[in-house]
Amino acid sequence: MNVFKNFEQKIKKSLKESDIKGKNGENLDLSKITVDPPRDSLHGDLSTNASMVLAKSVGLNPRTLAEKIIALLKDDPSIDHLEVAGSGFINIKLTKSFWHDVLKLMITSGTDYGRTQIGQGKQVNVEYVSANPTGPMHVGHCRGAVVGDVLANLLQFAGYNVTKEYYINDAGKQIEILAASVLLRYREALGETINKIPEGLYPGEYLIPLGQSLVQEFGDKLLTMDNEKALSIVKERSIDAMMTMIRQDLATLNIHHDVFFSERMLYMNNAQAIRNTINDLTLNGYVYKGKLSPPKGQTLEDWEPHEQTLFRSTDVGDDQDRVLIKSDGSYTYFAADVAYFRDKFHRHFDEMIYVLGADHAGYVKRLEAVAKAISGNKAKLTAFLCQLVKLFRNGHPVRMSKREGSFITLRDVVKEVGRDPVRFMMLYRKCEAPLDFDLEKVTEQSKDNPIFYVQYAHARCHSVFRQAQENLQIENPSNDLMIAHLDQLTNDSEISLIHKLAQYPRIIEQAIVYKEPHRLAFYLYDLASNFHGHWNKGNDNPELRFIKPNNKKLSLARLGLVQAFINVLSSGLKIVEVKAPTEMR
């Protein structure tokens, strides 16, 4: 149950049924009404902007309108107190019995508390990672991989039918470079001395085993084989080997895609998928023959001073028209991207989400233009960028050089610090902001390490139940909690904890609506901080401790509160795909 959404609906229902109308007697637009936690908990449990957003259309001062809205709500048995604050916000204080009922729901719902059906079974495609199959995943890929995976998990938790997709860029120039690099390692495996990797080829030693495997399979036959045939074999083996490596890298983070879509599929049957796409765009008036103006002070992809086949993307929001077919008749990378989107659209997804790296900033507008043109404005597309990850060790930058092949792989990082710190900390900044990842800090056992602090809160919760079994002789906590007298929880600190727990369904919905999975990581840390804070209060004041050996009734009520923490922390950590330990030493 989303307490905030429920009260928003209550307020809207009360207004609809009231005599409060627009200045000309019209019904009010209630869509901008929100209910949120107040900035200061001393101001109440909920705060609504209802009078602020309606005052102009009603023709009343916001504070005057607020008093009228308060009159509509004052008889609600779950409300303890209402007041007008500032220029017209309404603060709402709820009864303790209301919060006890919410806590009961948290206990009985288990880890399903916070689960919603706002997705209503809608089909959503989340494409993420989609790294070129030219080498192992490096630390820079971690962020988009985790963000995409957790966003997909959030959507599934909220009732969406999600497809996790990886687009394999296996038809471009980088594959030619990969094949040439592997052929060099093949010759090396046959005994040829390679003193230096030529400029422009991939220098990484990860290609050495691939060269050796080609020798085991073909001996020296590739050297005497028709060059085109040999190159085709090397490309095939190289792509397969790189994708196997990438899948294994992602598996270390427990990331598993449902679909791996090969770009080469678009070029099958004489590029039929691309030709069909261009035909569709042509029929709808989006394709023409022409010349693009030369770039001013910047490099324009695929620019040439000859007539080309162009996509009229400026008609659908792009900054400039885009080349589909070059003057020599070859298709651009962009043409394949358009065909790929068309394929997704024909798979009947209600929404398509792209999680992209920061280097794709210029790609978003053209992608949005493609979506409008292909779908006739029917497709819902969301694309967002993940900024760079900067790697540190104890505050000092870790130097990497892709040119020299000396980069830190995803697998290296997971092996050193573990999967959980990587997954959690990759969420611990907004995507738009660069993220600093310190290999030492993420394994510290301190409050300054968010993943430790959250997992430690979960483990502490379980330790409370172990204490209860020792001190209260509780044999079956689940049964005892079902009959716990939650009205024993009257301390403001305890009620405040219930407030914080009750924000979980709201956080889930916001993370989905705004496509911001970092909100979940932030919330889990705040929730853990609240729990640890209450634990520390119990150290200073024995009356606040969870277990009171001489008062089983109160102890059971407090155990109910602890169980709610276990449920919410377990649920959130499961979405993030991080372990929820029951014990930490």
Swiss-Prot record:
Origin: domain of life: Bacteria
InterPro entries (alphabetical): aa-tRNA-synth_I_CS, Arg-tRNA-ligase, Arg-tRNA-synth_N, Arg-tRNA-synth_N_sf, ArgRS_core, DALR_anticod-bd, Rossmann-like_a/b/a_fold, tRNAsynth_Ia_anticodon-bd
Q: Which CDD domains does the UniProt record give?
A: ArgRS_core (cd00671)
Q: Which reactions is this enzyme annotated as catalysing? A: tRNA(Arg) + L-arginine + ATP = L-arginyl-tRNA(Arg) + AMP + diphosphate
Q: Choose any GO biological process term that the UniProt entry carries and state it.
A: arginyl-tRNA aminoacylation
- The catalytic activity of this protein is classed by the Enzyme Commission as 6.1.1.19
The entry's cellular-component GO terms read: cytoplasm
UniProt xrefs under SMART domains: Arg_tRNA_synt_N, DALR_1
Return one GO MF term.
ATP binding
Show the coiled coil region(s): none
**What keywords were assigned to this record?**
Aminoacyl-tRNA synthetase, ATP-binding, Cytoplasm, Ligase, Nucleotide-binding, Protein biosynthesis
Locations listed in the record: Cytoplasm
Show where the record puts the motif 'HIGH' region. 131-141
Which family, according to the similarity comment? Answer: Belongs to the class-I aminoacyl-tRNA synthetase family.
Q: How does it assemble?
A: Monomer.
Against NCBIfam families, the record matches this protein to:
argS
Q: What is this protein called?
A: Arginine--tRNA ligase
**Organism the protein comes from:** Bartonella bacilliformis (strain ATCC 35685 / KC583 / Herrer 020/F12,63)
